[in-house]
Amino acid sequence: MIVGYRSTIITLSHPKLGNGKTISSNAIFQRSCRVRCSHSTPSSMNGFEDARDRIRESFGKVELSPSSYDTAWVAMVPSKHSLNEPCFPQCLDWIIENQREDGSWGLNPSHPLLLKDSLSSTLACLLALTKWRVGDEQIKRGLGFIETQSWAIDNKDQISPLGFEIIFPSMIKSAEKLNLNLAINKRDSTIKRALQNEFTRNIEYMSEGVGELCDWKEIIKLHQRQNGSLFDSPATTAAALIYHQHDKKCYEYLNSILQQHKNWVPTMYPTKIHSLLCLVDTLQNLGVHRHFKSEIKKALDEIYRLWQQKNEQIFSNVTHCAMAFRLLRMSYYDVSSDELAEFVDEEHFFAISGKYTSHVEILELHKASQLAIDHEKDDILDKINNWTRTFMEQKLLNNGFIDRMSKKEVELALRKFYTISDLAENRRCIKSYEENNFKILKAAYRSPNIYNKDLFIFSIRNFELCQAQHQEELQQFKRWFEDYRLDQLGIAERYIHDTYLCAVIVVPEPELSDARLLYAKYVLLLTIVDDQFDSFASTDECLNIIELVERWDDYASVGYKSEKVKVFFSTLYKSIEELVTIAEIKQGRSVKNHLLNLWLELVKLMLMERVEWFSGKTIPSIEEYLYVTSITFGARLIPLTTQYFLGIKISEDILESDEIYGLCNCTGRVLRILNDLQDSKKEQKEDSVTIVTLLMKSMSEEEAIMKIKEILEMNRRELLKMVLVQKKGSQLPQICKDIFWRTSNWADFIYLQTDGYRIAEEMKNHIDEVFYKPLNH
């Protein structure tokens, strides 16, 4: 039966339902952190549409918070005409006007774990003010802040900006040259290490921390981008002008930023690609992307255009490259894993990027590596997957993540993405979403167009609306269950929840309520049929059921072998006739023969399994076994029937096409193998036929399991390829293909990477969170 959902028994009590590309660009290497705040759940539709309109507008905005650190470095650039005058005096004005009450500079509002960031930004601002002999009062207050907070310099619980251990001590040296008296203990280990450090390679991104020791001419030659910057970093580009004052393109780059922001600069620029990638990813994670389909398509079209052009905003940055690959591939764009080939070797990766690589780059590479769609050619992704997985697992073992959210993100990424329920993940992302979320490079920053009150409230309200719809549909499903007295056929009421959860994962679109309920009903009906042919009915009764289906419109003349068959067929007949009526209204044509043929094919093969295989009369080949059992598992019946309820008219020719056959075949193999891997020991004891027992006739159990996992992965990749890659001449709408992939996802979700069922309590909590528990709990 489909996805083997009955293997997990859940008892859930609820009053509503009764009982029961050169890597040296570290400029986007960043850590995402969140500031927790209380959730205020909107109780009505007030503002929902307005918030949606404002979110749509955010696609046209590129917003990043001011960086005190980078602005200070730009402020230190001398005029082209006089070394005694600032080139950008407006930045000095901004520094003077934006000192915080405690005497510091940095992200506003700040965060208790960002003291190192504040210390770095404050010292940079003090250097700028002291260099140009302005802001005496601000300097005094800034020195006071550094004196009182210098304990944080070597504190391991504090989040460090990238390159802090190089840049901060270097700025201390610069302060000494300017006779700026810092009350800092130079015996602090961070400072001591850096002052004794012989600078080596892989530190170009934080070259401002190396200063005069850098070969700036060589750095500009090797790393200057088309926009004139070094690594899209205003601070590093400014440092090039401070220590090597002869580059017109660097000046033009900084001028272009100040033309936009007047008197301050962000910590990276340009930010359009970064903002678009993060915004699309965030909308998907929050589960609200369906409200912004046209905006997301326009954004991804732009990213794909740049991908094809090998634009440096994507390919000079690990995070951008990996994220673009993942978002584009999962959105049906043709992208090749060849573009990630530079990252296949861990040693090479770290040799180029150095130790200043945060977990975000590794995390994004790992996410991208899970999207292999070709067993022969995607060894690039396999190699990336292997070393990134090992790296992150080691990080977890060593407790190498400073904040809880980073650790959680890595734990989720280490589970295959197709084993994670989107619904639960949407809830988790909403719960952890914060308006004051920040990320950190050499300075902490925020993205107001990605993290804001509008998106927060909109996501909550969207989740509430979906949750309310699910509760209403569950009521309908329960009434159907009771009206057809399915409990009399061995189906306990407790299966309502997990069956419906299956349907929600496969058909999540709110507007497809009929398809979702059809899917859930068919899973239960298939379970009943499976029970009858597996153990509840005799062979004569099974033959009786087949004849009743064959003579569907004249079933009364067939008669019943038993009362049990009568009750069963009566339920099956009424249910299917009801669904046929709805399907024919939606399609505007007769679909009854096609649906009945699917049922007839299924029950005949179920009988063959029972009479021929399970009795030991014949032993099927591996191919025959997988073909037959994929059908009896429901991999044709349920997805194909669901196609009629997806809001589009679909011809019988399409549903009988080779493309559909391939989708059914791969889906069925994935479902069957996952089930057999779980049940192998139990089935061996019962002397039943499984792919495990068949392979063990010629090899050991360990070898059989290994071989089966290879077959599983091959079919999963082939299925993903058929769903994601646009086949020339295909007439099958994308939503029809998606049903097959999501069906396999549900099986992976249940079997959890083939190492054990989700325990009942975990599934109960999952159902509770998705269907009932308010977000503020």
From Swiss-Prot:
GO terms for cellular component: chloroplast. The keyword Manganese applies. Its cofactor is Mg(2+); Mn(2+). Keywords: Chloroplast, Lyase, Magnesium, Manganese, Metal-binding, Plastid, Transit peptide. It comes from the Eukaryota. It is an enzyme of class 4 (lyase). It catalyses: (2Z,6Z)-farnesyl diphosphate = (+)-alpha-santalene + diphosphate; (2Z,6Z)-farnesyl diphosphate = (+)-endo-beta-bergamotene + diphosphate; (2Z,6Z)-farnesyl diphosphate = (1S,5S,6S)-alpha-bergamotene + diphosphate. The keyword Transit peptide applies. A motif (DDXXD motif) lies at residues 530-534. Belongs to the terpene synthase family. Tpse subfamily. (2Z,6Z)-farnesyl diphosphate cyclizing enzyme. Produces (+)-alpha-santalene, (+)-endo-beta-bergamotene, (-)-endo-alpha-bergamotene, and at lower amounts, (-)exo-alpha-bergamotene and (+)-epi-beta-santalene. Not able to use geranyl diphosphate, E,E-farnesyl diphosphate or E,E,E-geranylgeranyl diphosphate as substrates, but able to use Neryl diphosphate to make the monoterpene terpineol. The Asp-Asp-Xaa-Xaa-Asp/Glu (DDXXD/E) motif is important for the catalytic activity, presumably through binding to Mg(2+). This is Santalene and bergamotene synthase, chloroplastic.
